[in-house]
Curated annotation (Swiss-Prot):
It catalyses: a 5'-end diphospho-ribonucleoside in mRNA + GTP + H(+) = a 5'-end (5'-triphosphoguanosine)-ribonucleoside in mRNA + diphosphate. It is an enzyme of class 2 (transferase). Its main location: virion. This is Putative mRNA-capping enzyme P5. The lineage of its organism: Viruses, Riboviria, Orthornavirae, Duplornaviricota, Resentoviricetes. It is found in: Virion; Host cytoplasm. Keywords: GTP-binding, Host cytoplasm, mRNA capping, mRNA processing, Nucleotide-binding, Nucleotidyltransferase, RNA-binding, Transferase, Virion. Disulfide bonds: none annotated. GO terms for molecular function: GTP binding; mRNA guanylyltransferase activity; RNA binding.
Length: 804
């Protein structure tokens, strides 16, 4: 049948605001991809077929029969990249041994496409356990990809709970929490990875703006956390910092940050997280079993563990799982001069250290006497802590007293976030604690009655009191910057209390001093486009100049300044996506994944300093490639509008021809081809003026303009799109580049490699010419529902980067 026999629709017939809104909404579930590595081809065949038939899952199988899988990776993941917004589960089986593709490389590739990494190569062919796991994947489809890009998960802990949330209309807010918690975890993982790459002497992160999971995420990545807050409400307790029995219904907890719970079985998690964040030298009394520490990366910490229940096997497990420098002592700590001499001074003489106490004895009367002994010992230890040999920083003591108690050097007496039913408190002794304070049993009883009456969520929120011990108060824009300094400023510095000029100067100074700083803020132009398209209601988000006012369903209102890419570029900051940061650190990431994104999160963009980019990210591999981001948007729109492949590429050729005609290029100098491999052929030499300088075309050239750039501009209307990062890579790849020797060659499967060189992608002319048609191109594809600001900002970056 001839092409003329078909009725071919065009974009203007089908693209309206509803189409734009649908694309934004499909972004919530973008990349429903799982990639499973296994050794059993027959199992892959069987379950691939079952998942296709049972749930409509789109499946692929890569089989490394000859030990080479680069071409299969290229063809498979190029196909996957077009389907990431299709709303269907994608499942790739890769049957290859680890000597062909390592787990580390497999994870990096999977996460580059925002997928779930599944490693099953520890199971042999035909093994029943393997079939049981794959059978479960088949039964749970399409929920197999929970979570994406992470090992643990913050959100609902079971599929049943996830589904029940949907019926209660709670999923929308949960998605915002889900992805924002993933974001914080990913930022910590990336910062930790780069601190190692940069050989930081001090692995401490300054986090601007309080949010509880940063502490937990930090310890999973071997870093300590310090928060910086402008101020905090009065805790309304006793003592020098008002944290002795702080008020449970006061402003501190009323203004607590919403977040998803940790494992409620791990009651010591919050207290120990704070203590390990305070010091890298820990004396842990009554440590056994310490299962809550096993997921931490404690490399760089030293812990003297004292407990009669510990043995060599326990110690070996803890060392292997956490990489901690462990001194196990299988004995009782006697809380006397001998313990001080034999343990404290022996291992901590002249070294700052902290003590965690979780020891106890059976029997109410005996336990009370035991606590008296401990309290007296700890008070004396703290008061002697100013000596050169004994430098105790903080002591956390298990507290469950049965009578009135007089304390010295008590800094805080706090409820345990997960210990409400135990009616147990934590006492913190410090040299700056109260000189003397009376703790009445009746007051403690009343306090614990109030605490146990709180909801579980409210009890868990009380960990904010503990986190006040690792919070500094003051102007975040006066933080010290420079080498060996790491700062995370996401969802915080953009707050309206921080004037934009000061923030941009702070970022500029930080970047110039080679501070490892990560900045996240609303993308002003994308938020404007969201409002214009009706994806966010005017009652929920409003803009006045560059000030954005947000209002959530509960009525809470907050204001942030929106930032543009061009503003951040002037401050030497380069945009990079959260997922790209995570791919870079995938080999060491030990944080959480996510199930779904949210429209709110897609309002934000993140930036890192230019010096970091130039030093570590100057050559693009799949981890930084836009291939997993850009093509799916254009493909989705094409499919919504039934625009044929032939028509789409002919359209690009038509726009290019208009540019050539406008610039008085003779039509005898070129031949428009308009295919996916060629835009036009040059028949005789000609030049075209452009904002980036003169473009020169030579007879015989086969010109293929950059489709990635065109697709990137479409994507930038919907999600964070790192234009400068990609443009810098693109300019570098206008000539062949040596294949980096320190990276797995498979990370470059989307490149053409010849004689150890990465072949060039596009010429300067092909990129700039694409930029010259991009406004008309996007206006046509989005049927006039595009953002001039987004387009102009991107093209300006291209012109400046490629200026001759």
């Amino acid at each position: 049948m001839a092409i003329d026999s078909y009725c071919i629709p065009n974009f203007s017939q089908t693209i309206d605001n509803r189409t734009i809104v649908n694309i934004f909404q499909s972004c919530k579930y973008r990349s429903q991809l799982s990639v499973c590595f296994l050794n059993d081809k027959s199992a892959a065949d069987k379950f691939s077929n079952s998942m296709r038939q049972g749930s409509g899952t789109i499946t692929f199988i890569i089989h490394a029969e000859d030990g080479e899988i680069s071409e299969q990776l290229h063809s498979t993941f190029r196909s996957v990249s077009t389907m990431l917004l299709c709303g269907m589960q994608l499942f790739v089986f890769i049957v290859a041994p680890r000597n062909v593709i390592s787990s580390e490389t497999g994870k990096a590739i999977t996460w580059a496409f925002r997928g779930s990494f599944i490693e099953l190569r520890d199971h042999g062919r035909g093994e029943q356990a393997l079939h049981d796991i794959l059978e479960q994947f088949y039964r749970l489809s399409p929920l197999v990809n929970v979570p994406k890009m992470g090992m643990a998960y913050y959100g609902p802990t079971s599929f049943a709970e996830l589904l029940s949330l949907s019926s209660k209309n709670k999923t929308s807010w949960r998605y915002v929490i889900d992805y924002s918690m993933f974001t914080r975890s990913a930022l910590v993982g990336f910062a930790s990875h780069m601190m190692d790459e940069c050989s930081f002497a001090n692995k401490q992160i300054n986090v601007i703006g309080y949010n509880p999971p940063y502490v937990w995420a930090g310890l999973r990545h071997g870093v300590t956390t310090r928060f910086t807050e402008m101020s905090t409400p009065d805790p309304e307790g006793y003592g020098p910092i008002k944290l002795i029995l702080p008020r449970l219904t006061g402003n501190v907890l009323l203004k607590k940050v919403k977040y998803v719970q940790h494992d409620p079985q791990k009651k010591l998690l919050c207290d120990d997280s704070v203590m390990f964040a305070l010091s890298r030298n820990i004396l842990y009394i009554g440590v056994y079993p310490a299962t809550h520490l096993l997921d931490y990366n404690l490399k760089g910490w030293r812990m003297v563990a004292v407990d009669p229940k510990i043995n060599a096997a326990w110690a070996e497990t803890l060392k292997q799982r956490t990489s901690i420098d462990l001194v196990p002592i299988s004995a009782k700590f006697e809380f006397n001069a001998q313990s001080t001499r034999d343990i404290v001074l022996k291992y901590f003489s002249g070294v700052p250290f902290s003590i965690i106490d979780d020891s106890w004895v059976e029997g109410t009367e005996d336990y009370e006497k035991f606590q008296e002994l401990k309290q007296s010992y700890f008070e004396q230890l703290v008061m002697n802590g100013s000596t050169s040999k004994l430098r105790v920083s903080m002591i956390s003591m298990k507290w469950n007293r049965t009578k009135d108690v007089k304390c010295r050097r008590l800094l805080a007496l706090l409820p345990q976030p997960y210990g409400g039913s135990l009616r147990e408190l934590r006492a913190y002794f410090h040299v700056n604690g109260a000189a003397e304070v009376n703790i009445k049993k009746s007051e403690v009883n009343s306090y614990m009655d109030k605490f146990t009456s709180l909801s579980i969520s409210e009890q868990i929120g009380s960990q904010k009191f503990m986190h006040m011990l690792i919070t500094n108060y003051g102007d975040a824009l006066k933080l010290k910057t420079g080498r060996d300094k790491a700062i995370i400023a996401s969802y915080s510095l953009s707050n309206a209390i921080n004037k934009k000029e000061r923030v941009l100067k702070f970022l500029s100074d930080a970047a110039k001093s080679e501070t490892l700083i990560i900045f996240g803020a609303p993308n002003l132009n994308r938020v404007k486009f969201m409002i214009k398209s009706g994806i966010v209601l005017g009652s929920d988000v409003t803009i006045s100049n560059d000030l954005i006012t947000f209002k959530n369903a509960s009525g809470k209102v907050w204001k942030d300044y929106g930032y543009t890419q061009s503003e951040l570029i002037k401050s030497s900051m380069i945009e990079i996506t959260i997922e790209q940061m995570l791919c870079i650190s995938s080999s060491s990431y030990n944080g959480v994944g996510y199930f779904a994104n949210s429209i709110y999160n897609d309002m934000f963009s993140w930036y890192v300093p230019e010096w970091l980019f130039e030093k570590y990210f100057s050559i693009q591999d799949i981890r930084l490639s836009p291939v997993a981001l850009v093509k799916c948007f254009t493909t989705s729109i094409r499919n919504l509008c039934y625009v044929p492949h032939l028509t789409y590429y002919a359209l690009r050729g038509s726009f290019v021809e208009k540019v050539l005609i406008t610039n008085n290029v003779l039509n005898s100098s070129y031949l428009i081809t308009g295919t996916s491999h060629s835009t036009f052929k040059v028949l005789s030499n000609f030049e075209v003026p452009s904002p980036a300088g003169v473009l020169k075309f030579k007879a015989g050239d086969d010109v293929n303009i950059s489709g990635h750039l065109l697709s990137l501009v479409i994507a930038a209307h919907f999600v964070a799109s790192p234009t400068l990062l990609w443009a810098t890579h693109m300019k570098r790849m206008t000539t062949p580049v040596n294949l980096p020797k320190n990276l797995d060659k498979l990370l470059f499967f989307d490149n053409k490699i010849k004689n150890g060189m990465l072949e060039k992608w596009h010429s300067r002319e092909e990129v700039v010419l694409a930029a010259m048609i991009v406004e008309n191109y996007v206006a046509h594809i989005l049927n006039g529902r595009h953002s001039i600001e987004i387009i102009q900002e991107i093209t300006q970056v291209i012109y400046e980067k490629f200026n001759a």
